[in-house]
Structures are given as C-alpha cells and as structure tokens.
Amino acid sequence: MIKKLTINDVDYIEQIFNLEKDIFKNSAFSKESTENLVKADNSFIYVYLIDEKVCGYLMVLDSIDVYEILAIATIEECRNKGIAQELLDKIKTKDIFLEVRESNKKAINFYKKNNFKQISIRKGYYSDPTEDAIIMKMEVNNE
C-alpha cells in the first residue's frame, strides 16, 4: 500500500530516518529534515507499506511546474519487486529532476528505463566519498 505521509505519521517518519541512515549513510536526511518535508506545503513523502513497515519511500520537492526527487529507496529485502517503480509512477504528472551518484549504476539504469535523460554533471557534489552527481530529467508530455 502506498501512503502519503502527514505529520501525524510519527512512526513512519522514524522508520524513514533509520532507513536513510542505513541506505544513504553520511548523505542521509536528518530526522528534522524528514519531518520538515512532511510539514511543508512544497514537499511530500510517499511510503510503500507492507504490514505497517516502510519498505520503500519517495521524498519529493514540489516546485510549481516540476518535481525534484530528493530521495527514493527500497529496503534491501524488498528490492526488485517493483516498489520503486510504483512510487515513481505516483508522480509522473509533471517533469521530474533528480541527482544521483555517478557510481550508482543500478539507480541510473532504473531512471533511464523510466525515460530520464542526463542533462548535467555536478562535479564533487557528494562527499564520503567525493563523487560527481549526474543530473537527470524526465519530461512528461502533457498533450
């Protein structure tokens, strides 16, 4: 089940914070940042739940005409089951931007499969280890 978080979803926010530390290590969002994304008018978080457990999540910044994916992740035991795809499909209503570590080939291939195109590189964007970010964009045809 996919759910859009509200500030009352304290347990899910805590789960996301813990997953962020496990998955993204030093580049993880803080608990406060995660809570702020839920509270703000221009951002939101979707979670994919199985038996009240967060198995995947999508953090999005909602600009007027585009979305920016801040984070998308699936826990290890739930990978390759289409969870990230279902989460991404929820926001394919306007153009989407994201950045991804250049070494994260699995994610890059996932994005390419979803019609994201590389548009730029940010040199040295990530730390621990220092690494370039690939900026990607998916355009939605609203004809």
Which stretches of residues belong to each language-model region?
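C-terminal "cap" of GNAT-fold acetyltransferases
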Residues: 101-105, 124-143
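Conserved acetyl-CoA-binding loop-helix of GNAT-fold acetyltransferases
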Residues: 74-76, 80-93, 105-113
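Acetyl-CoA-dependent GNAT
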Residues: 6-77, 85-90, 140-141
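Conserved hydrophobic beta-strand within the GNAT/NAT acetyltransferase core sheet
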Residues: 69, 96-100
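Conserved active-site tyrosine of GNAT-family acetyltransferases
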Residues: 20, 111, 116, 136
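Extreme N-terminal starter segment of soluble prokaryotic enzymes
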Residues: 1-2
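Residue-level detector of beta-propeller blades
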Residues: 54, 118-120
